[in-house]
Amino acid sequence: MASQDADALVTSSDPLHPANLIPELCRSFYQLGWVTGTGGGICIRTGDKVFIAPSGVQKERIESTHIFVLPYPQAAPSPHTDRAFLRRPAMNLKESACTPLFWNSFDLRNAGSCIHTHSQHAVMATLLWPGPVFTISHQEMIKGVRVGGTGAALSYLDTLELPIIENTPNEEDLKDSMAEAMLKYPDAAGVLVRRHGVYVWGNDWEKAKTQTECLDYLFEMGVRMKLAGLPTVLNEA
């Protein structure tokens, strides 16, 4: 694709265009402490195109011209390998290291957006739940989370479960363990990464964003309950 045509993919006056939304959302997430120190990432899939933030840049300073565009579908991007692009930024940037993991959300959940944060609440949850799953029940904010991230809304009476996978030195190497966790916990709306953060997806960017917010609230609440010696799952027997 010619450079001028490729740049047209990220040029729009529409504030809801993915190339405009991603910088706006990254600034918002930065203020929440989710993507500081260049960490974290976000992607938005619209039809046959995937818009992805760059890696290793200050997320609060991302501009639309920094956005990568990839075709979808394509073979799931493998860690540390080249992949097909519709557009690369002119400057020397690299696409998000989260890209293979974002593809998990597309291929396994048909998600329209996936968000990765380095939230301290998420990290603390992985430390206080040493097992393979985070659990919490009877919290109003559970109603803001959907079955599998893309299905029906959960109920106040449901017990929310989110799998926890072990971290790896390189982000891309989490791809397979994340996919395994998604298959083992098909009702989960995200995957926690121990001592690292969380991946959350949704049908579109709005649902991915609101579910990330709800889950972050639940991580914080769960951590506070654990530290106060309170059970996070009520026994109704």
UniProtKB/Swiss-Prot annotation:
| Record localization | Cytoplasm
Which molecular-function annotations from GO does this UniProt entry contain?
methylthioribulose 1-phosphate dehydratase activity; zinc ion binding
Top-level taxon in the UniProt lineage: Eukaryota
Keyword annotations for this protein, in alphabetical order, are:
Amino-acid biosynthesis, Cytoplasm, Lyase, Metal-binding, Methionine biosynthesis, Zinc
Into which EC class is this enzyme placed?
lyase
Principal location class: cytoplasm
Record-listed substrate binding positions: 98
Cofactor binding mode, per the note? Binds 1 zinc ion per subunit.
Query: What pathway, per the record?
Result: Amino-acid biosynthesis; L-methionine biosynthesis via salvage pathway; L-methionine from S-methyl-5-thio-alpha-D-ribose 1-phosphate: step 2/6
Which amino acids does the record list as binding Zn(2+)?
116, 118, 196
Pfam family of this protein, just one?
Aldolase_II
Residue spans making up a coiled coil are: none
Family affiliation: Belongs to the aldolase class II family. MtnB subfamily.
Protein's recorded name: Methylthioribulose-1-phosphate dehydratase
Source organism per UniProt: Laccaria bicolor (strain S238N-H82 / ATCC MYA-4686)
